[in-house]
Amino acid sequence: MKKILFTVFLIPLFSNVFGQETKKDTLKPIQMEEVIVIGKKAQITDKQSKTLTSIDDYLQKSAKVDMIKRGAYAWEPIINSMPTERTLVTIDGMRIFGACTDKMDPITSYVEVSNLSEATICSGQEGACFGSTIGGSIDLKRNQNSFGTKKWNFNLNSGFETNNQQKIIGTAINYANKLFYVDTDFMLRDAENYKAGNNQEVLFSQFKKMNFSATSGFKLSKNKLIEASLIYDKATDVGYPALPMDVSIAEAIITSLKYEYTPLNSIVTNWETKVYFNTIMHQMDDTKRPFVPIHMDMPGWSKTYGYYSKMKATLKSHHFLLNLNSFYNKSLAEMTMYPADP
C-alpha cells in the first residue's frame, strides 16, 4: 500500500518539473540586408507634374478637401466639411481676404500650379500656425529658387482643352547666381462655355484669366537673405451657371518682403520675418443675363496689411516653433439695383 501511494504522489511532482522547461529555438536569427516590395507600378502620367492643370484639380485630390463648384473657374475649397469662415487659407503664410460677398473669389484662385511648390493641408488646430481656425488650414507655398552657380532657365507651356475650348499658354524665366536669384511665372487661360454629356452646352461657364508671379532674393551674408515677391492676377468675363450673376472683373495684387536669418551654432535653426500687403477688387453683375427686369451690381474691395515672425529651434530631440503674427483688413462692398428699362 505504501509503494502505491508513493508512486501516486510522484506523478504530479514530475509533471510540474517538466512543465517549467522551455524549448530552445532552433531557428537562427538572420541579418536582413534589404527588403524587396513587389507591387503595381504607377503610370508615368501620375508622377509627372501637370503644370497646365488648375489649382482646383490639384487640391481636390486630398481626402481632407472638397470643392464647391459653381462654375468652371474658382472653386471654393472646403476643409473637413467646414465652411470657409471656420478654415484658413494662406499663400506663403500671408492672410488674404476675398472681396466678394458670395465667395466667388477664393484665395486659391490667385496661385497657378506651375508656380506651386506644395500645399500644406492641416486639420483642426494643427493648422493654427498663421491664425486661429477650427476646421483646418491650407497654406499654398510657391516655388523658391536657391543660390548657386550662374544659370538661366526658360520654360514654355501651351495646351488646349476640347470640352470648353480652353486655350492655355504659360512661360517661366528663372535666373540664379551665388548672391541673387529671380523667378517669374506667367499663365494665360481663355475658355468658352463648357460642354457636358451629349454635347450639351452649359451657358455662362466661360472665363478669361491672367496670372503673373515674380520672386527675387538677395543674399546679404552667409546666413542672411532678403526676398521680395509679387502676384498679379486678373480675371474677366467669368460666368457662373449655378448663380444668377457673373463676374465682370476680379483683380488682385499681393506683395511681400521677407527677411530670413539662419543662426550658426545655435539652438535656433531659422528665423523668418515677413511684412505683406494685398488688395483685391471684385465686381459681380447680371448685365449679360437675359430676362432680368431689375439689374444688380455688386462690387467689393478688400485690403490687408500684415506681418509674421516665425522662429524654429531644436534642442536635442525636441523641436520648437514660435510664430508671432498680426494683420489688419478693411473690406467694403456695395450693391446697386436699377431697372433694365428705366
What do these predicted regions represent?
Residues 21-56, 84:
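Short, acidic, small-residue-rich periplasmic hinge/interaction motif at the N-terminus
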Residues 21-23, 191-193, 203-207, 223-271, ...:
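Flexible loop and strand-edge segments within Gram-negative outer membrane beta-barrel domains
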Residues 48-59, 75-78, 90, 106-111, ...:
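N-terminal periplasmic accessory domains that precede
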Residues 58-95:
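Extracytoplasmic beta-strand/coil segments of soluble accessory domains associated
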Residues 67, 95-124:
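Short acidic/polar hinge/loop motifs at secondary-structure boundaries
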Residues 75, 134-136, 152-154, 167-171, ...:
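Hydrophobic, lipid-facing positions within transmembrane beta-strands of outer-membrane proteins
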Residues 84, 177-180, 219-223, 262-266, ...:
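Outer-membrane beta-barrel channels and translocator barrels
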Residues 158-164, 177-179, 188-192, 232-236, ...:
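Transmembrane beta-strands of outer-membrane beta-barrel pores
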